[in-house]
């Protein structure tokens, strides 16, 4: 009996080793990212192996385990990419940062790029003219300006004609300012919604006839902040949450037309969305000019002054390597079977997972330690209240 059990256990070990090698080879060859679904399946297979080995003493358990492994292996996506040549893609927000990098990246791949910029005479636009090929066309595009959107639509329509537009990458976005939600002026909330959400809707609605004609791709650059609350991101996160849900609904609506929709949720990348010290100072002054006197008194100017430190810290802990985002956007545009959701970057999946599946106190403590470690100061009224309690 012991010999049979040893032979059975050895069979499971051999099969597991063989299966692991085959899976690793297929994952590497097809550049498949190990994300939550893949990890869950692998853990399930491990538990199934233990169960089959312990409960079934016959070949039935072995056959069940082999069948499960085979199903998992077949389910691993094969990286089949479409050719980039001849495809036309519109990218918004190409003046700097991620949009600028995307314009260069897809131009090098041979895509006909329409790079939308706020300033055609700006430094970013000039660099794109200098380093990119004649395939790239610079266009003046403010996503909040309906007139500019219509002008760009007419230009693109005349060029692509019956072929249609293969892809739109909604990259244009603003952060506004990081501060307690009560402190943010309504103007910042409106700016975030206008650019990050309403602008995307306006451009999408205008270009959908061309996108449907090509049975192309709609790609939105959202954010991990659209899935989980982060202290100080009230305006930005609300706009990205709206964008995330818009993308999810459009995926359902456009499926019947053959248009595939993908949402990319980057986390921890260094782009110009954080702004500069001059912008932080301007926004800080805007906050001071707009908050009510009693609110300013409750928070205290020493607390308000730490807000600029928050921007500086966030801009220094991010990664300047944008390649994970570029590769994911490329997959969304050119893969035969694109994913709906991509999560490149540090903690892009971990943070939403903690928020959804763990007790709120676990996530709240994690968020506090991760995003506010340098802010060891309370608002003035809370400090005074604590001092009074200690005296009592």
For the regions a language model picked out, list residue spans one by one.
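Active-site helix of classical SDR
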Residues: 204, 239-242
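Residue(s) in the substrate-gating loop at a strand-loop-helix junction
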Residues: 223
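Canonical Rossmann dinucleotide-binding motif of NAD(H)/NADP(H)-dependent dehydrogenases/reductases
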Residues: 72-114
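SDR active-site lid
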Residues: 256-339
């Amino acid at each position: 009996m012991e010999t049979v059990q040893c032979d059975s256990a050895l069979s499971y070990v051999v099969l597991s080793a063989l299966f692991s090698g085959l899976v690793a080879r297929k994952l590497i060859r097809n550049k498949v990212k190990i994300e939550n679904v893949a990890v869950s399946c692998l853990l399930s297979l491990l538990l199934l192996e233990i169960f089959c080995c312990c409960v079934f003493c016959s070949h039935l358990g072995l056959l069940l385990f082999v069948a499960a492994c085979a199903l998992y292996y077949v389910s691993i996506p094969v990286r089949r990419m479409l050719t980039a040549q001849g495809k036309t893609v519109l990218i918004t927000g190409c003046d700097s940062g991620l949009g600028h990098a995307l314009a260069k990246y897809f131009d090098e791949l041979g895509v006909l790029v329409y790079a939308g910029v706020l300033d055609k005479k700006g430094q970013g636009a000039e660099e794109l003219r200098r380093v990119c090929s004649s395939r790239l066309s610079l266009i003046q595009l403010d996503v909040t300006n309906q007139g500019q959107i219509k002008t760009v639509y007419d230009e693109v329509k005349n060029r692509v004609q019956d072929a249609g537009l293969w892809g739109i990458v909604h990259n244009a976005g603003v952060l506004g300012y990081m501060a307690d939600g009560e402190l943010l002026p309504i103007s910042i909330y409106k700016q975030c919604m206008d650019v990050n959400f309403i602008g995307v809707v306006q451009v999408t609605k205008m270009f959908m006839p061309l996108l449907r004609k090509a049975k192309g791709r709609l790609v939105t650059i959202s954010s991990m902040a659209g899935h989980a609350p982060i202290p100080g991101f009230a305006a930005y996160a609300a706009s990205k949450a709206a964008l995330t849900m818009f993308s999810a609904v459009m995926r359902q609506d456009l499926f019947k037309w053959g248009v595939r929709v993908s949402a990319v949720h980057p986390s921890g990348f260094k782009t110009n969305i954080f702004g500069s010290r001059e912008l932080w100072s301007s926004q800080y002054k805007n906050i001071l000019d707009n908050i009510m006197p009693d609110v300013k008194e409750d928070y205290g100017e020493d607390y308000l002054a730490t807000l600029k430190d928050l921007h500086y810290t966030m801009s220094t802990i991010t990664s300047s390597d944008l390649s994970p985002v570029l590769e994911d956007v490329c997959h969304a545009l050119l893969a035969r079977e694109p994913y709906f959701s991509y999560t490149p970057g540090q903690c892009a999946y971990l943070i939403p997972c903690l928020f959804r599946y763990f007790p709120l106190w676990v996530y709240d403590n994690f968020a506090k330690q991760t995003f506010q470690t340098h802010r060891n100061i309370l608002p003035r009224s809370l400090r005074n209240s604590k001092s009074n309690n200690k005296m009592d």
